[in-house]
A protein has these predicted regions:
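Tryptophan-paired
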Residues: 99-163, 259-365
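Beta-strand secondary-structure signal
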Residues: 54, 58-60, 149-151, 233-235, ...
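Hydrophobic, glycine-enriched assembly/anchoring segments
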Residues: 355, 361-411
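Sec-dependent bacterial lipoprotein signal peptides
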Residues: 1-42
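A sequence/structural signal for flexible, mid-protein segments enriched
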Residues: 199, 203-300
């Protein structure tokens, strides 16, 4: 593939200036190419201008606002903007950061790029994928004339260099799917196809553009004299396709009854995977395994309460793109996926026995379809202490506190 060089471009401009009439204005490089034929009739040009066989593109990759109060832009049925900070009593101290990481999204700074050439047919099926890796937010590379599709997603970086996300690029060239694998922990509630829960994914952002026209007329190109290249800018907006949920079980009147939590919890009915190109989550419902921590004497509007809190990342609800859901359904404030969503947390009581509490949080998950705070409140004066011998108490099925605040125990 031939690339126009700075030397050739400058030599061409110099030759044109010397041989053409002095009465013509010197035009900018990008406009000069388009007007070269009618202006330069009878002029001698040396050296001959040879354009590259394709176009050079600079892709800038901005990212949507990562602040949770901007991304969680829900509006209630009453038209009141959602303020998650007024619901979140667990907090996020330095020890939480050490155990679980940051509370919100982290800014990525490196990206994987897949380029698909479709010839003269925009949005045609892909036959080959060209790979690029970018440090920073700009990709500069060469393209053949014709139409291109471009997919970008952030590189995954973890503290221990072990990532949960797996990317499937082999099944089809027309899309890339991300998923995670199963843990060794059991999944008992509303994950009928799987006996174990799944690892939560890392923060994942993606952008996909189709039918990018790299044409011989150099429409939308400009000439960069410093680099000696024709350039076309494409802005690709990366959006989150994994969603953060902040969970908290608030114990009123605990009085030392619950003293600890196991450390692992599950949120069920969530998607197993996501298609990067569309951002639409898969149809298989799973339980996502995540970590929780027990805090004593937290302040809740002046009341001292104990809280079991945690943060989980997931692909969101099945069969939807959480980021774009509200944009495509004006006025809709709830995503009804037809699934039940349970959060289970195993707690240890003061007598040394443990019990798994299972909370129906379907309404909260469907209302917070791209993440948010999930809260369950328990009045421990109404919760019996397990006393069965053998170290294991009961599994308590507790309905969503927004559905009336009653508690149903399956003893």
């Amino acid at each position: 593939m031939k690339i126009i060089s700075r030397h050739i471009a400058l030599s061409f401009i110099a030759a044109w200036r010397k041989s053409c009439c002095k009465g013509y204005a010197i035009l900018s490089a990008s406009l000069f190419l388009a007007m070269a034929s009618p202006i330069l009739i009878g002029c001698v040009r040396e050296p001959e201008l040879h354009l590259h066989d394709g176009g050079d593109i600079i892709i800038k990759m901005p990212i949507v606002h990562l602040e949770l109060d901007v991304f969680w832009d829900y509006v209630t049925d009453l038209g009141i903007p959602y303020d998650w900070t007024k619901e979140w009593y667990y907090g996020w101290d330095d020890y939480d950061k050490e155990l679980f990481g940051t509370l919100g999204y982290e800014q990525p700074d490196a990206f994987n790029i897949r380029r698909y050439y479709t010839g003269m047919n925009p949005k045609a099926p892909h036959t080959q994928a060209l790979s690029n890796y970018v440090n920073g937010f700009v990709l500069e590379t060469s393209f053949n004339w014709g139409f291109w599709d471009i997919l970008a997603w952030n590189d995954i970086k973890t503290i221990d260099d072990i990532q949960s996300l797996v990317f499937d690029e082999a099944t089809t060239l027309d899309s890339v799917t991300a998923y995670t694998n199963m843990t060794m922990n059991s999944s008992r509630y509303h994950a009928p196809q799987f006996t174990r829960s799944f690892y939560q994914p890392e923060g994942l952002f993606a952008a996909y553009e189709q039918g990018i026209d790299i044409n011989r007329n150099l429409n939308d190109f400009y000439f960069d004299e410093e680099r000696g290249l024709w350039v076309k800018n494409i802005n690709m907006l990366l959006e989150p396709i994994t969603y953060i949920y902040l969970t908290q079980v608030i114990f009123h009147n605990n009085k030392g009854r619950v003293v600890a939590v196991e450390g692992n919890a599950n949120l069920s009915g969530m998607a197993r995977s996501v298609v990067l190109n569309s951002g639409i989550a898969g149809s298989d419902a799973i339980a996502v395994d995540y970590n929780v921590r027990f805090k004593k004497d937290c302040n809740m509007n002046g009341e001292s309460v104990d809280i079991a809190g945690g943060r989980l990342m997931s692909f969101g609800m099945c069969n939807i793109n959480g980021t774009r859901f509200a944009k495509t359904r004006a006025g809709v404030t709830r995503a009804d996926d037809g699934l039940k969503h349970y959060m289970d947390v195993t707690m240890q009581f003061s007598n040394g026995m443990d019990s798994t509490f299972v909370f129906d949080v379907t309404d909260q998950v469907q209302t917070r379809y791209k993440g948010g705070v999930i809260t369950v409140e328990l009045d421990m004066d109404t919760v019996p202490i397990p006393r069965r011998k053998g170290g294991s108490g009961f599994d308590a099925v507790v309905v969503d506190y927004e559905d009336g605040g009653t508690y149903e125990f399956d003893m």
